Amino acid sequence: MPRPQRSERVRELLRARHFRADLFGARLLADPAWDILLLAYVAALEHGRLLMADLCRAGLVPATTTVRWAKTLEKEGWLTRSSGPIEDPQSWLELSPMGRRNMERYLTFIESSRPA
């Protein structure tokens, strides 16, 4: 799937997650690690990396939770940081090669599972 279409598909997933949170409550169904990976993947498709401040603003959870999960994802090898401490709103994050590869595999699976 071309990048613009895939980017829009991931944005649809994010909008659906936000709508679900509105209906059922963000605390009940929070999944900050997955939200971070989806946002980082959109950034990878559109411009390469993601500013920590933007990541914190986009989340459905408090900024401290976003930072904690971003640290975990970095430690586990899903994200890389290109400047400053991760707590710094001006830090840049991006998917690691492993993160990008697995997000590609996941979206390919989702797309191939959709009815035509």
Regions found by a protein language model. Give the residues of each.
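General nucleic-acid-binding
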Residues: 1-6
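Short alpha-helical segments that sit at the start of domains
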Residues: 10-38
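Amphipathic alpha-helical dimerization/coiled-coil segments
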Residues: 20, 104-116
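Short amphipathic alpha-helical elements of helix-turn-helix/winged-helix folds
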Residues: 39-43
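Short acidic, hydrophobic short linear motifs in intrinsically disordered regions
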Residues: 46-58
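Short amphipathic alpha-helical interaction segments
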Residues: 60-75
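A short, conserved structural fragment
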Residues: 74-85
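Short, cationic-aromatic polyanion-contact patches
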Residues: 84-107
